[in-house]
Each structure stands twice: as structure tokens, then as C-alpha cells.
UniProtKB/Swiss-Prot annotation:
Disulfide bonds: none annotated. Part of the 50S ribosomal subunit. Forms a cluster with proteins L3 and L19. In the 70S ribosome, L14 and L19 interact and together make contacts with the 16S rRNA in bridges B5 and B8. GO terms for cellular component: cytosolic large ribosomal subunit. Belongs to the universal ribosomal protein uL14 family. One of its GO terms (biological process) is translation. One of its GO terms (molecular function) is structural constituent of ribosome. Pfam families: Ribosomal_L14. Keywords: Ribonucleoprotein, Ribosomal protein, RNA-binding, rRNA-binding. Binds to 23S rRNA. Forms part of two intersubunit bridges in the 70S ribosome. This is Large ribosomal subunit protein uL14. It comes from Pseudomonas syringae pv. tomato (strain ATCC BAA-871 / DC3000). It comes from the Bacteria.
Length: 122
């Protein structure tokens, strides 16, 4: 469960290393975001010569959370940390590689590109 001020790792090669959630999109007073939800983030740490710079405000999709996601069969998939993938204005990933596993819940029309780039889908 990601909320405002939550710090997330970046799971792509866009140049950002760490981002902070500044808004959960989808509803006027929505508090939490889970896996597959879109959030507004600001870049807190970035590498030199990356595609994004520190202080930039971006859109991102949550791909891993410590809270996890519950499946229909009752199983829960949790991760060691919270991670997001940065998106451009067309909701496409900025990076060309995805690091770490992603869940099957991202397998929608919007995020098939992220699922296909990921090394492992749980």
C-alpha cells in the first residue's frame, strides 16, 4: 500500500534510482495505491546522464509492494520492497529494461509492455 510521502525504488533504467509518491491518482480522496495503480512521483535520487533528473515530477505505475497482492485462490504475493516503473505522458514506460519480478496483475492492455520487458512474471 503506497500513500503520499512513500519512498519507492525504480525498477527500470530511466535514470532514476529512488522516487517519492506525491499523489495517488484515481479518485478525489484516494489514499492508497496497490500493484498496477498509477501514482504521481518526484525523483529523489538519479544517476548522472540518465533520462530523468532529480526534482522532476513524473507519472509511475506501482509494480511491487511490501503489502503484496491477494489472488483469487487465497495466496498472497509479497515483495521485500516497494518499486515503480516511470511512465511518459502516453502511459508507456520511459526505460527500455525492467529489473526484478512483476506480478500477473499488470497483465492488462495498458501495461503489457512492462510485463513483456520483465525478466520474471509471478
Amino acid at each position: 500500500m503506497i500513500q503520499t510521502q512513500s519512498m519507492l525504488d525504480v525498477a527500470d533504467n530511466s535514470g532514476a534510482r529512488r522516487v517519492m509518491c506525491i499523489k495517488v491518482l484515481g479518485g478525489s480522496h484516494r489514499r492508497y495505491a496497490g500493484i498496477g495503480d498509477i501514482i504521481k512521483v518526484t525523483v529523489k535520487e538519479a544517476i548522472p546522464r540518465g533520462k530523468v533528473k532529480k526534482g522532476q515530477v513524473m507519472t509511475a505505475v506501482v509494480v511491487r509492494t511490501r503489502h503484496g497482492v491477494r489472488r483469487a485462490d487465497g495466496s498472497i504475493i509479497r515483495f521485500d520492497g516497494n518499486a515503480a516503473v516511470l511512465l511518459n505522458n502516453k502511459q508507456e514506460p520511459i526505460g527500455t529494461r525492467i529489473f526484478g519480478p512483476v506480478t500477473r496483475e499488470l497483465r492488462t492492455e495498458k501495461f503489457m509492455k512492462i510485463v513483456s520487458l520483465a525478466p520474471e512474471v509471478l
